[in-house]
């Protein structure tokens, strides 16, 4: 495979899957713009990668898409080969426990922000015959219920529908769209969503026992697939949602 340099955007790149994806692209020499809310974690993501740049912005801010567009012009040569819509927010709680702020925050980050950012980047994506990768969730696949995390799951299920619909809409413009649906990945997201560390550790242990491969995933497990899907050899793949979950979603 010819190792040509690509221009890549990764949202939610300050930790977890986003950090692993950004580092994986940067390690192969791609120009990477890592987007996230907080400058410090973003700086840690790009440390040691001279072609990686950061943009600290809340992706739900109405001004965020145009801020990214400006960085594309200044840092990425005006083209986008790969856009990874990874930024996510989860708030655990059953229906009677969620307030409006928690509901709207999850929909804004997990569903609305990818729509508006992808829309803003259509021209640089088309110029590059680019790829959009939407990071969903294996928990949103199929017909399995997800009590306590239903709003997050509903938003991620909506993202999967966007993946399939955009593949049809944008294919004539030379843009591919693929979904990657991680299973239970050890990212610390549960603690950030309100779980205690003890509860989160117990959750990971229990889920690892349910996964056919016998363990929960690592961020690098997901990043490997995202990078491979951007390779020229994958150029005929579009509209699919790939579960990276150790087989959990088919149990």
UniProtKB/Swiss-Prot annotation:
Disulfide bonds: none
Knockout mutant characteristics: Cells lacking this gene accumulate maggiemycin.
Active-site residues per Swiss-Prot or TrEMBL entry: 152 (proton acceptor)
A Pfam family recorded for this sequence: adh_short_C2
Binding site for NADP(+): 58-59, 86, 152-156, 185
Pathway the protein acts in: Antibiotic biosynthesis; daunorubicin biosynthesis; Antibiotic biosynthesis; carminomycin biosynthesis; Antibiotic biosynthesis; rhodomycin biosynthesis; Antibiotic biosynthesis; aclacinomycin biosynthesis
EC numbers for this chain: 1.1.1.362
InterPro entries membership: NAD(P)-bd_dom_sf (IPR036291), SDR_fam (IPR002347)
GO MF terms, alphabetically ordered: oxidoreductase activity, acting on the CH-OH group of donors, NAD or NADP as acceptor
Function: Involved in the biosynthesis of aklavinone which is an important precursor common to the formation of the clinically significant anthracyclines such as carminomycin, daunorubicin (daunomycin), rhodomycin, aclacinomycin T (aklavin) and aclacinomycin A (aclarubicin). These compounds are aromatic polyketide antibiotics that exhibit high cytotoxicity and are widely applied in the chemotherapy of a variety of cancers. Catalyzes the NADPH-specific conversion of aklaviketone to yield aklavinone.
Family note: Belongs to the short-chain dehydrogenases/reductases (SDR) family.
Protein name in the entry: Aklaviketone reductase DauE
């Amino acid at each position: 495979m010819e190792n040509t340099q690509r221009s890549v955007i990764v949202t939610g790149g300050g930790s977890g899957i986003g950090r692993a994806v950004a580092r994986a692209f940067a390690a192969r020499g791609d120009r990477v713009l890592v987007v996230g809310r907080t400058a410090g974690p973003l700086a840690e993501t790009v440390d040691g990668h001279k072609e990686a740049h950061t943009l600290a912005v809340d992706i739900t801010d109405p001004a965020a898409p145009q801020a990214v567009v400006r960085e594309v012009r200044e840092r990425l040569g005006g083209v986008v080969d790969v856009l990874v819509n990874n930024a996510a927010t989860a708030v655990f709680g059953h229906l009677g426990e969620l307030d409006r702020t928690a509901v709207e925050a999850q929909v804004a980050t997990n569903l609305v922000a990818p729509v508006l950012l992808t829309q803003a980047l259509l021209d640089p994506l088309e110029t590059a015959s680019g790829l959009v990768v939407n990071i969903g969730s294996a928990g949103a696949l199929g017909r399995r219920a997800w009590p306590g995390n239903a709003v997050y799951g509903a938003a991620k299920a909506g993202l999967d529908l966007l993946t399939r619909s955009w593949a049809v809409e944008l294919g004539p413009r030379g843009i591919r769209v693929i979904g990657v649906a991680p299973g239970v990945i050890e990212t610390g997201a549960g603690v950030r969503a309100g779980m205690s560390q003890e509860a989160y550790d117990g959750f990971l242990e229990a889920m690892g026992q349910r996964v056919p491969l016998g363990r929960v995933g690592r961020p690098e497990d997901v990043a490997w697939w995202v990078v491979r899907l951007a390779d020229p050899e994958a150029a005929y793949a579009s509209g699919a949602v790939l579960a990276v979950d150790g087989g959990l979603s088919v149990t």
